Amino acid sequence: MKHILLSCVESRIEHNRSFYSRFQLGPFDLGQGLTVGNAFRRTLLSELSGVGITLIEIDGVCHEYSTLPGVRESVLDILLNLKQLVLTSDTTFTVPQVGYLNFTGPGVVTAKDLKLPVSVYCVDPDQPIATLSADATLNFKFLVCQGKNYIIQTPVDKFHEYQKKILNSKLNLPLSSRTTLNSTFERPNQDSLVGTPLQEGVGKTKQNKRLNAHFQRQLKQLNRLKETSFKAYKTKVGEKTISDEFQTNSVNHQNLTTFDLREKKLTDVTTSLQHGEEATLLKEEGLNKLDNSSPQLENKLKGGRDFSGGSQLASQALPVDTLFMPIKKVNYMIDIDPAEPDRESVVLEIWTNGSIHPRQAVHEAAKQLIHLFSPFLQTHLVPTTLQSTPYSKAASKTQEFSLNETSTEKVKDELGKVAFGSENNTAALNQQKNLVTAIQTLDIANLNFSLRTFTFLKKENINTVSELVEFWTRQKTEAKDSIQSNVQSSVLLEISNNLKNFGVLPTS
């Protein structure tokens, strides 16, 4: 049989966060390639560990839907950029590590500006995080953890506390598009012209849209008032007066219709002119209010304070759904060499995120598979050390317990004959009683019997260790009484050796 080899056929670096390699594994017997390829693929995608950011606390940010003054990206975009960072570590750590960032604009914040923990570094230092304008600052700290697969965090308690705080504070919207929740303010007995509470990030375009919508609502209200007053006037004067006047002047129906149409057109023109003048006045009044409040608002926004009390809201830790998997994609294909039709090989394609080399990923996957299947390997029972008990050495050699005596009283009688060298006799008694009970119900498949002996015992309907001890005792009694038995001496010897190694029978 040829040696099974792992050879790299092709490898390339597509970019800093994408490594590709194609390996050939084999040769294998027909049918083994599918088992190996599928096992490697599933292990590579699920069992390899990685490093990622799991928790972020940004200075002055209470939730991920807010914005920061002087920062182009919203907090949600910053969280997504940090989630996409590819981190790696030379060592394995179980305790979360702390990193931080202190950056003052103008400039673009990249991964190389992060102050990462020891032995943790970023694969792509030029990966962007945020863009800051002049006099803008971005300060935050984060946790770096190591894990497998991915985690989805649902901090229900934190969000519930945040919502209660918002409802109790009754905060309105800021007017600037570059503010955080710290710059929100109260406007008592006034309606906000920009937005509704719990909204942020309203830009200049949205401000204009909101103002236009507000003016349209005001115009609709004026239209309703004019229509109501006009109907009341017609009701008070009466329509019969107009019709009688036309009838007395001998005006026909066609002239009356023409007069109504002209009157309607004249009314529409007059109303539109009035509405236009009122809309212009309202718009100028609103813009004057915005211009007058701009300096005061700008000072408040720069200071990061609210108008209600001047106190800054506390920052909240924002969880991140982290993806720890260093493997992006795995494909495998079974290849049969025409020169050797009875042999096959596996072609394995691996794409990584740059935090691990594809060849190292194959080695780690093989280790994980070995670790996964190692508990199912054949185990060899080590001779027990039941003689090293708190009892005296002389008594422990001569003492033998009968496993088919299951009553507690008999176990106490047997143990009472032993000279204890320990003061805690009750604990030793309970431990020995539990051990005897566990051994009694143990299946004989846990003993190292040969296939022939195991088959013989099963045919004799011997399934547990207690039944095996009873069978061995009966065979020993028959041998003393010179009764011929159909059990071979080799089988009895194997049973005796296994029971001695298991600690059920004395070794001498």
UniProtKB/Swiss-Prot annotation:
Q: Which residues cross the membrane?
A: none
Any one of the GO BP annotations: DNA-templated transcription
Alphabetical list of Pfam families matching this protein = RNA_pol_A_bac, RNA_pol_A_CTD, RNA_pol_L
Region (Alpha N-terminal domain (alpha-NTD)) residue ranges read 1-380
Reply yes or no: does the keyword Nucleus apply.
no
Predominant location category: plastid
Coiled coil where?
none
Q: Region Alpha C-terminal domain (alpha-CTD): what ranges?
A: 434-508
Q: Where in the cell is it found?
A: Plastid, Chloroplast
Q: Which InterPro entries match?
A: DNA-dir_RNA_pol_insert, DNA-dir_RNA_pol_RpoA/D/Rpb3, RBP11-like, RNAP_asu_C, RNApol_insert_sf
Q: What does this protein do?
A: DNA-dependent RNA polymerase catalyzes the transcription of DNA into RNA using the four ribonucleoside triphosphates as substrates.
Cite the domain annotation text: The N-terminal domain is essential for RNAP assembly and basal transcription, whereas the C-terminal domain is involved in interaction with transcriptional regulators and with upstream promoter elements.
Mind telling me what this protein is named? Answer: DNA-directed RNA polymerase subunit alpha
Organism of provenance: Oltmannsiellopsis viridis
